[in-house]
Amino acid sequence: MKNFLFKKNKYLVSFSLGSVLSLILPPYSYTALGFLIFPTLLYLLFANRDQTRKSIFYIGFLFGYGYFLFSLYWITYSLNFDDNLAILKPLTLVVLPSVVAIFYGLASMLIKNTITNNFYFIVVFSVALSTLDFLRGNLFFDFPWNLFAYTWSWSLESLQILGFVGTYSLNLFTIFIFCLPYLALKHFHYKKLFIVISSIVFTLCANFFFGQNTINNNNLKKIPNFKVVLLQPNQKIIDLTLANNEEQYVNRLINISKPKMHKDTQALFVWPEGILSNLDNSKNYKKLFYDNFSNNHNIVLGSVRYEGNKFYNSLVLLNNQAEILSSYDKINLVPFGEVIPFYNLLEKINLKKITFGYGSFSKGEKRNPVTLNINNIKFLPLICYEIIFSGSIDTEQKEYDFILNISEDGWFNRSIGTIQHFVHSKYRAIEQGKQVVRSTNQGLTSSILPNGRLAKTTDFANQSSIVVDIYKLNKKTLFSEFENTIFYLLTFVSCVFIFLFRKTNE
C-alpha cells in the first residue's frame, strides 16, 4: 500500500497534498491540516529519496501547483469584465500557479541530499521552503501572496509575534512546526509522538500567551480632534470605465461622504482607487468641492496621472477646492493587471493588461509619507496590491501616523481573494505598529488598529461609509525598525545549525 501511494502515485499524492493544504488559508483557516499535510509531504520525499533530482523537483512542483491552483483560482474572475480576455482564463489557471510552484520544486530539489528521517531534515526543509517563498515574493516574481503564515489570521494573540519578527519569520516558524509530527512517522512510538505533540502544544500556547500579554501592555493613544471617513461606493466596475459617468460618480461619492455633517471637524475623506480617469480632471470639480467640503477637510482619492507618454496609478491628496496638495505613484504594479511584462513582444499578439486599455502603467519612483494640510498628520500611502509586501512597504522617512490603503477589490468579486487581501492589511498593521485604514469600491472597507484588532468594517460589497478615529501605539515595533533583516538573521542562524550538524555527523 505504501509503495502504491508513495512510489507509483507520488505525483498524484503530491498534487493532492498541495490542493488540500490550500484550505489552511483564509477564509477557511483550517490550520490543523498543516500538521497532517507537511509530515506526509516529508515522508513522500523520504520514500523517493533514491529518485533523480528531476523526480524530486516534480514532487515539490506539483505540491506547489495544487496549493496555488486552489488558492489563486479567483484571479480568473478579473477576466470577466472584457470579452477579449476570456480566452486567457484556462491559461491563467495553468501558467500563474505553475510559475509560483517552480519555487517549491526548486526547494525540494535543492534539499535532495539532506532527506533523512530526523530533526536535521525538518530544519533544512523549513529553511529552504521559507527562503524560496521570500525570493519569489521579493526578487524574482514580486508575488508574495499566500504564505503559509497567513493561516494564523484567526488568532489575534498568535499574530502579535509579527511586531517582533515579521511575516517571513512567522512563515519559517509555521513550516517548521507543521513538520514536527514527521519525527514520529518513520519509526512510530507513542513516547516519541507524545514528545512531539507536547512540544507543539507548548510552543503554540507560549506564543498565544505572549501575544495576549503584548496586547494587554500596548497602550493605544487616540489622535484628538481628527476623523477619517472611509467610503465604499459599491459601483459596478464596468460603469467606472465610461468617461461620461465620472462627474456623476464624483457627485455620488460626495453624497455618500456627507461632508456637511463634519464641517466643523478636522477630517480626511478617503475615496477608493481609480476615481478619476485623468488627474487633470480634478480642476473640473473645484466648485463642487468648495460647495460641499470645508477648510477642515482633505480628500484622498485614486486617479490615473499622465506625464508625457507615461501614465501612473496614483493616490492624490486634495483640499476643499480640489487643488492637488500631494500625489503618490504606485511602485508595486500587478503583473498583467497593471503592467505587461515584455510589453513590446506581447503587444504584437494583441495582449493587453486586465485593467481596461492597452499599455502598461509606469512604476513610481519612491514612497514617502503624505502630510495633511489641516493638522500636519502624516500617513503612509499604499495602493491596492502594495499592502501585501511584508518588510518593504516602509520608507526612509519612518515617522508617520497611520497607513492608508486605497483599493478596488471588485475585480475579484466576493471571492476568497478579496478576504485574503483584507487579511494582509491586518498583518501589516501588527508588523508596523500602525493603524491601517482602507477604502475599496467593492470588498471590505475597514479600520484595523495597530495591534491588528478590527475597529470597524463595512458589510461585504455594500454601499456605505464609516467614520473612524486614528490610534497610535505607545512605541515602535521591533520589526518596523529592522524589517526583514530579522528574517535574514533567523535564516543565517538556522544555516549555521545545519552546517554544524553536518560537520558533527560526518
Where are these regions (language model features)?
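Membrane-embedded alpha-helical bundles of multi-pass enzymes
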Residues: 2-215, 414, 425, 440-445, ...
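Soluble catalytic domains of enzymes that build or remodel membrane lipids, polysaccharides, and related
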Residues: 214-482
